[in-house]
């Protein structure tokens, strides 16, 4: 997720880049809406792309803003639009008083029911709508004096059943028409479902990793645990638009470098801690880094430096801490890479093999989560 602020002037009041809230009147009721940006933007993305901006989970600043809004505008309802993620939202709701509703989507988890979080001022309703326009959250509020009741529905969006808005359709066509030839080019075919969202892997990520290992001639590859990108069905053609749909970021360049076995393990441990840390405020988003060419075991309930074990190459030879291995990857956060963009690598690979078939060999052993129905590898 990237911050884009084209042609927006700095908002100077109390050092905010933009006004942190707005007031909307809905059916005669004053609704205060406060925005919460993704707190780890300069960590999960290159900090150089958001210079002079700061981000974070600032409970006291939010509480101060909320208190001022209540005094100045006396809203009937306070809503926070959040890019935090469901776990962070739940913790925030328990520690900041006066928020009625938090509507979020960062974790991309479609949560079917509202989560009621208790705090010192009462209860905050926390909802999460998923991603990619698959769902719309609808919350009906019925006021009775200063109190209210609510009804919540998570509505699935079936695009085939929706008539497009004509103005928006014309606008999209106007923007995309110059690129249609490139976007519609068929570069390969999928033998099975290519998707992104699993905790530890995704078959489209397997495609990207296999592309790097083959085109860049590396032993193993790393791909970020991004959560976005539309699924491709079995026997469906893979177009350039599909490749861009999973890779279109402003730092797409690939890299090849030698890494020690110790460095490889440290990378896996660091990413795992960002995901599985017991403190939601230390979870920085995304799913586990995707890998090809290696096998490992992971215990999410362990602490940092103790989650990853039994790290091996695909031929079952142990990865040794002091031995060097040839590694490829893309979307480097800390370095400006000079390699070709990942979409060029994936396209070259697909044009060579024509049809991509996923190797379903189990390379990741998840320990201690046998009864967790949310784990899918």
Language-model features, listed with the residues they occupy:
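Acidic, metal/ion-coordinating pockets
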Residues: 1-159, 199-211, 275, 357, ...
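Catalytic centers of hydrolytic enzymes
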Residues: 50, 57, 130-377
């Amino acid at each position: 997720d990237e911050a884009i602020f084209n042609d927006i002037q700095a908002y100077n009041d109390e050092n905010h880049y933009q006004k942190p809230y707005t007031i909307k009147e809905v059916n005669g009721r004053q609704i205060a809406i406060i925005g919460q940006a993704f707190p780890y933007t300069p960590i999960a993305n290159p900090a150089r792309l958001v210079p002079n901006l700061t981000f974070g989970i600032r409970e006291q600043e939010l509480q101060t803003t909320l208190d001022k809004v209540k005094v100045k505008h006396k809203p009937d309802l306070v809503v926070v639009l959040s890019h935090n993620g469901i776990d962070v939202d739940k913790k925030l709701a328990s520690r900041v008083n006066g928020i009625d509703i938090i509507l979020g989507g960062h974790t991309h988890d479609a949560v079917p029911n509202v989560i009621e979080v208790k705090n010192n001022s009462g209860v905050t309703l926390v909802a999460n709508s998923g991603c990619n326009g698959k769902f719309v959250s609808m919350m009906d509020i019925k006021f009775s004096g200063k109190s209210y009741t609510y009804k919540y529905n998570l509505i699935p969006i079936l695009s085939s059943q929706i008539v497009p808005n004509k103005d928006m359709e014309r606008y999209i066509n106007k923007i995309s028409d110059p690129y249609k030839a490139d976007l519609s080019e068929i570069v390969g075919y999928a033998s099975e479902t290519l998707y992104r969202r699993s905790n530890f892997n995704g078959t489209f990520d397997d495609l990207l990793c296999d592309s790097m290992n083959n085109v860049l001639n590396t032993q193993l590859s790393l791909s970020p645990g991004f959560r976005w990108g539309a699924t491709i069905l079995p026997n469906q053609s893979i177009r350039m638009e599909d490749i861009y749909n999973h890779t279109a970021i402003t730092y797409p360049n690939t890299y090849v470098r030698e890494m020690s076995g110790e460095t490889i393990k440290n990378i896996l441990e660091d990413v795992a801690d960002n995901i599985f840390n017991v403190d939601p405020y230390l979870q920085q988003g995304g799913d586990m880094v995707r890998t090809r060419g290696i096998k490992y075991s992971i215990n999410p309930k362990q602490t940092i430096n103790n989650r990853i074990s039994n790290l091996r190459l695909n031929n079952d030879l142990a990865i040794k801490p002091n031995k060097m291995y040839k590694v490829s990857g893309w979307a480097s956060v800390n370095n400006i890479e000079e390699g070709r963009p990942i979409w060029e690598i994936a396209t070259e690979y697909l044009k060579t093999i024509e049809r991509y078939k996923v190797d379903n060999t189990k390379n990741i052993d998840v320990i201690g989560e046998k009864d967790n129905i949310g784990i899918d590898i």
